[in-house]
Amino acid sequence: HFSPAYPLSEEELASWGFSNVEELGLFVEDPYSKGKYHPLIGGEQTLAFNHLSHSAQESYRHLHHYYFYQRHNDFWYSNAMKKLQQLIASTNMLTCGEDLGMLNESVTRCMNNLKILSLELQIMPKELGVGLGNPATYPYLSVCTTSTHDCPTMRMWLGERNGTGDATPQECSATIATNMAAPSMLAILPLQDWLSIDGSLRKGDAATERINDPGNPNHYWRYRMHITIEEMIAASGFNEKVKELASRQ
């Protein structure tokens, strides 16, 4: 169950039609609050659920959705506001949030109210039904990037989209240019994505530039820069390209 959490009292459960809660096998008692309960995360897949009447099953489904997707919104929001305001006030640094993927609405509400910068990534757009985000629509209070440590590099996802498994330096330059022109306050791009604009500097195999694949336990944080800092500094053509792209507004 969630922790911290806002468990249900026996009276609340009774209002949903559930009594003798401990005998049902569909709830777990809160370890810190006796007489208060949490619905099982996978309750609908249990034999106990199958033994319920049709109306009780519908009630449990509604309760399950309410508990996991609605009940905690304000609870988490108030806790986050209380803690994050103190943390933000303790430093002069900009505060940025990693808000990619599925989010509870309270996360976005809290970040907006505290002016915490969001993270914007084209391959993980925040708009429903959109396959690829448009950097031109990013909010000012955001950090724009082309990839992260836990996702494919820009070369990789561009290659997946064009069907070749890789992207040319020209395609990479164009994508970076689009991101650098975004309204975001900051643009912070991984080194691999910058190197991808130069065919002589980037690695031959795009897949070897990925930092981490969360779905593969044998692939973790093993990327190492394949050229020295001195070699990169000496690459005048590359540095001119970076300078030109970084000046985009």
Predicted segment positions?
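Catalytic cores of glycan-processing enzymes that make or break glycosidic bonds
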Residues: H1-Q249
